[in-house]
Amino acid sequence: MEESSGLSSMKFFSDQHLSYADILLPHEARARIEVSVLNLLRILNSPDPAISDLSLINRKRSNSCINKGILTDVSYIFLSTSFTKSSLTNAKTAKAFVRVWKVMEICFQILLQEKRVTQRELFYKLLCDSPDYFSSQIEVNRSVQDVVALLRCSRYSLGIMASSRGLVAGRLFLQEPGKEAVDCSACGSSGFAITGDLNLLDNTIMRTDARYIIIVEKHAIFHRLVEDRVFNHIPCVFITAKGYPDIATRFFLHRMSTTFPDLPILVLVDWNPAGLAILCTFKFGSIGMGLEAYRYACNVKWIGLRGDDLNLIPEESLVPLKPKDSQIAKSLLSSKILQENYIEELSLMVQTGKRAEIEALYCHGYNYLGKYIATKIVQGKYI
């Protein structure tokens, strides 16, 4: 596989590069697939034919770096230029090698037909066409990331649409091309579903008189805040990804942050390592997102729950940390992405061995959440 040294790699310092996925037009993505195939055929037809290894950007933590914002408030995780090899002649990577070409074949067909598919739809297509190579969604997801790492272009450029779990509600008007504007304050407690079509999101007109954007970890908490119309008392827009954020929800938030750069973005999560990990995904991106990790990072602030809120919660509402929590805490502490006050919060969780859920605040009444958020905002208690 021939590689251009300048392809999709941005130099920061003399020893530091950011490897990233380009956003391409369909014909440009097809061209990169064609070049990959032609390079393979050229090697096979040479006087000394051989199966070439695939050089893929290494998506492990050892190849990750942190860019701490200097000219902006945004910091993010990114992958550097260390490569890993996938070979047909290696028993451990042979199937992965074939999967890459199978996924590229389907993507090429999708792009020719000017269609888009979700990764779930892609899984069922590959399961039908190549059952010996694709038996799980995880194998498809990894293969898609391998193709992104090989071609250096985004999933969306390959015709793969993000599956979105995201919802938005509050003081925001959204107008998709050729459609009537949607008032997100009038969509009921279920909110308005964020589309997985990134091109549509990119071309949606946004209008707001909000003063804050508030990300809520849990769907049930989002539902409560919207049902109580808290956005009428705190001029804000609520967003939830129902847990760990998907690409579409992160794209939507990033679009809002660039459209309305003066709006603070506040995050409400459970006081546990998983809640902090969710916040960090919005704030820095994640290694699991590969070459697209850095693209949608936003300067979010942690409004709660935090250690100084424990005095608001009955002792019996605190729950012991689970083994999974301890694993996440260890991973976060070793990642070197956390700022000092985040480390202090995480260390307190580990020291106490306890976790607290947002719902524990209901001991003060079901309408207390809005008052809690308002107090935090007025006192400027977010980090």
UniProtKB/Swiss-Prot annotation:
Enzyme active site: Y124
GO biological process, any: embryo sac development
Cofactor: Mg(2+)
UniProt xrefs under InterPro entries: Spo11/TopoVI_A, Spo11/TopoVI_A_N, Spo11/TopoVI_A_sf, TOPRIM_Topo6A/Spo11, WH-like_DNA-bd_sf
Protein name in UniProt: Meiotic recombination protein SPO11-2
Subcellular location: Nucleus
UniProt cross-references to Gene3D superfamilies, sorted A to Z: 3.40.1360.10, Winged helix-like DNA-binding domain superfamily/Winged helix DNA-binding domain
Result of changing Y124F: Loss of double-strand breaks induction
Segments forming domain Topo IIA-type catalytic: 24-167
Tissue expression remark: Very low expression in flowers and shoots.
Disruption phenotype: Plants show a semi-sterile phenotype and a drastic decrease of meiotic recombination, indicating that SPO11-1 and SPO11-3 are not functionally redundant. SPO11-1 and SPO11-2 are both required for double-strand breaks induction. Drastic decrease in chiasma formation at metaphase I associated with an absence of synapsis in prophase, due to the inability to make double-strand breaks (DSB).
Subunit structure of this chain's protein: Heterotetramer of 2 SPO11 (SPO11-1 and/or SPO11-2) and 2 MTOPVIB chains. Interacts with MTOPVIB. May form a heterodimer with SPO11-1. Interacts with PRD1. Does not interact with TOP6B.
Function: Component of a topoisomerase 6 complex specifically required for meiotic recombination. Together with MTOPVIB, mediates DNA cleavage that forms the double-strand breaks (DSB) that initiate meiotic recombination. The complex promotes relaxation of negative and positive supercoiled DNA and DNA decatenation through cleavage and ligation cycles.
The EC number(s) this enzyme carries: 5.6.2.2
Keywords assigned by UniProt, alphabetized: DNA-binding, Isomerase, Magnesium, Meiosis, Metal-binding, Nucleus, Topoisomerase
Source organism per UniProt: Arabidopsis thaliana
Keyword Protein transport listed: no
Enzyme class: isomerase
